[in-house]
């Protein structure tokens, strides 16, 4: 089978790196059953009868080992660009003391006991505490073979902030990295989702959460991460959109730097190459999708659930959690619940939104003249305010703060019709493969666990042009993975009308 050869070559390549004697003989891998076991254990499961989907198997050799004793922390973002390069947004501040034992004290950084500390605030009175390891920079670029091409940015890249992300230029690195996107012009966009910790600092309040005295490499101390940043591929700062708010406001249009809209903990970013419009999933505090000009950052429009504009923040906050609504029979919330976690645009103009706080996805038409404009759709009707349809994703799943909710990330298969919709679920730890035409479930990829091909807090899903899938985990998952595609290029047939639910 082609996939056995493909995976065998990948594993043989890994063996070469490790110096294994059997590296050149991929037949050994086939004969001892390793490849068959990988295919059986990490392939598509819960397949709907009479349907077709791409097939996958994990590549346990990807990525290649990182240099400089670097380790990845939680992965706040992952995206495959037009060159089939994989861009990763690492959270170095999520690493624990034992994971960064090789890190030394930061010059002049002391804790409350006047003891030298490293960049994450862990005490280093005698220099490095162990032989391993160091936090990798925040932005990393890999090729499809897993080779690291570039790495830059953030609080674990000493000296970079002073040169490339200066407050005088408008750059503020987020307190917690979240979301990365590379547009058709090779601009790198990132966001963050730190919440504001209390009153403004000038009024004696707390600093933004996660940027206190434990973090001498603290970045955003002014408020919540209410902005996104634009860089070139080498990490040179180009623009900031947004500000550092102290409260959420899902209808802000121009409260940020240079009159740009202020976000509140934005989660995801995409740029439409046909219109140069920037779409932001806003987010962990606000409850909307923002549309802005990708060159100037200026506001164009915004919309909430079912295309409603303005967004009723008060009603959403008063409603509480989705499981409570569901238990009470209120099964059609007229607002996004936090977090609004992703926004994606298909080639046919459909916009897909992860309404993670409501365990659902919603679909909109980017070409609708009503989308983003003041519009009322009180009954959630398709065809009004740019709204097209929706699908529940394991809708009985608990949401924050009990469980993280379901619809966390989406992407499309690279066939001409983009016929598959991949939906990541970071509570049930799987990727649902939907027929994008009818939003029925055709199968699943991955299960909960720590082994290759399994997930813990699955956070991102992104394909390359060949159909291979790349994934990223947060919480204690802290890894990126590659799934090799084989078999059909796209999806067809009508699967299970209900997406999610317990299955073997």
Name what the model sees in each region.
Residues 8-19:
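Bacterial N-terminal signal peptides
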Residues 1-6:
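Positively charged n-region of N-terminal signal peptides that target proteins for export
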Residues 24-504:
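Eukaryotic scaffold repeat domains enriched in small/polar residues
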């Amino acid at each position: 089978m082609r996939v056995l050869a493909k995976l065998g070559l990948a594993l043989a390549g890994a063996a070469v790196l490790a110096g294994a004697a059997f590296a050149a003989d991929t037949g050994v891998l086939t004969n001892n059953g390793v490849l068959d076991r990988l295919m059986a254990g990490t392939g598509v499961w819960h397949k709907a009868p009479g349907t077709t989907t791409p097939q996958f198997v994990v590549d346990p050799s990807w990525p290649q080992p990182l240099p400089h004793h670097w380790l990845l922390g939680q992965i706040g973002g992952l995206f495959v660009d037009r060159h089939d390069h994989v861009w990763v947004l690492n959270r170095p501040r999520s690493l624990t003391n034992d994971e960064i034992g090789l890190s030394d004290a930061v010059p002049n950084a002391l804790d409350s006991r006047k003891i030298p500390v490293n960049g994450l605030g862990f005490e280093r009175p005698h220099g490095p505490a162990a032989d391993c390891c160091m936090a990798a920079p925040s932005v990393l670029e890999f090729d499809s073979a897993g080779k690291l091409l570039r790495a830059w940015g953030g609080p674990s890249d000493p000296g970079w902030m002073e040169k490339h992300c200066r407050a005088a230029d408008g750059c503020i690195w987020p307190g917690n990295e979240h979301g990365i996107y590379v547009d058709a012009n090779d601009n790198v966009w990132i966001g963050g989702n730190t919440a504001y910790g209390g009153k403004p600092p000038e009024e004696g309040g707390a600093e933004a959460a996660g940027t206190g005295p434990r973090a001498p490499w603290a970045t955003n101390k002014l408020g919540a991460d209410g902005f996104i940043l634009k860089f070139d591929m080498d990490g040179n700062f180009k623009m900031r959109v947004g500000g550092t708010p102290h409260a959420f406001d899902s209808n802000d249009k121009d409260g940020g730097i240079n009159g740009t809209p202020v976000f509140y903990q934005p989660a995801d970013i995409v740029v439409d190459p046909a219109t140069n419009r920037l779409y932001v999933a806003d987010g962990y505090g606000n409850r909307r999708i923002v549309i802005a000009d990708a060159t100037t950052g200026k506001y164009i429009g915004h919309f909430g659930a079912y295309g409603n504009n303005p967004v009723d923040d008060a009603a959403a906050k008063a409603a509480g959690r989705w499981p409570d609504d569901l238990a009470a029979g209120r099964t059609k919330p007229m607002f996004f619940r936090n977090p609004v976690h992703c926004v994606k645009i298909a080639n046919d103009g459909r916009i897909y939104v992860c309404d993670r706080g409501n365990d659902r996805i919603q679909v909109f038409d980017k070409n609708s003249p009503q989308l983003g404009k003041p519009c009322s759709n009180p009954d959630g009707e398709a065809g009004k305010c740019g709204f097209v349809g929706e699908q529940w994703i394991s809708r009985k799943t608990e949401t924050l703060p009990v469980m993280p909710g379901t619809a966390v990330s989406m992407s499309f298969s690279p066939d001409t019709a983009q016929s598959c919709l991949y939906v990541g679920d970071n509570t049930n730890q799987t990727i649902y493969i939907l027929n994008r035409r009818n939003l029925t479930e055709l199968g699943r990829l991955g299960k909960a666990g720590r082994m290759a091909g399994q997930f813990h807090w699955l956070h991102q899903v992104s394909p390359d042009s060949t159909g291979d899938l790349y994934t990223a985990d947060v919480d204690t998952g802290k890894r990126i993975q590659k799934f090799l595609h084989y078999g059909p290029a796209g999806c067809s047939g009508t699967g299970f009308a209900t997406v999610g639910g317990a299955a073997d």
